From Swiss-Prot:
UniProt xrefs under InterPro entries: Rib_uL2_dom2, Ribosomal_uL24, Ribosomal_uL24_CS, Translation_prot_SH3-like_sf
Gene Ontology molecular function, alphabetical: rRNA binding; structural constituent of ribosome
Function recorded in the entry: One of two assembly initiator proteins, it binds directly to the 5'-end of the 23S rRNA, where it nucleates assembly of the 50S subunit. One of the proteins that surrounds the polypeptide exit tunnel on the outside of the subunit.
Self-association and partners: Part of the 50S ribosomal subunit.
Family to which this protein belongs: Belongs to the universal ribosomal protein uL24 family.
Name of the protein this chain belongs to: Large ribosomal subunit protein uL24
Gene symbol of the encoding locus: rplX
Alphabetical GO biological process terms: translation
A GO term from the CC aspect: ribosome
Ribonucleoprotein listed as a keyword: yes
Swiss-Prot/TrEMBL keywords: Ribonucleoprotein, Ribosomal protein, RNA-binding, rRNA-binding
Amino acid sequence: MSAKIKSGDDIIVLTGKDKKKIGKVIKVIIRNAKKKVVVSGVNVCKRHTKPRAGSGGGIFNKELAIDVSNVAILDPKYKTPTKVGFKIIDGRKVRFAKVSGEVID
């Protein structure tokens, strides 16, 4: 089964406090039929950690997951939000941007 959003994709946030921010997908989480993505520089919170053996404590920034419905892939040609389609080229199933028709991978 092919996924519409994969790690390493450039995306834009459509809704929420980080609306219109652009980032790269770090991780895709699929749990209990809910899909979420972790995006670099988006939905950042501060985590306070205690010192442990081998590492000091402190306050660190951490990216939290966002629901897949709140993000869209950036079109490689026009840099606008786009939907993703699938087509078969030379016997391989590839993703393409519906706005420009460019192949994503």
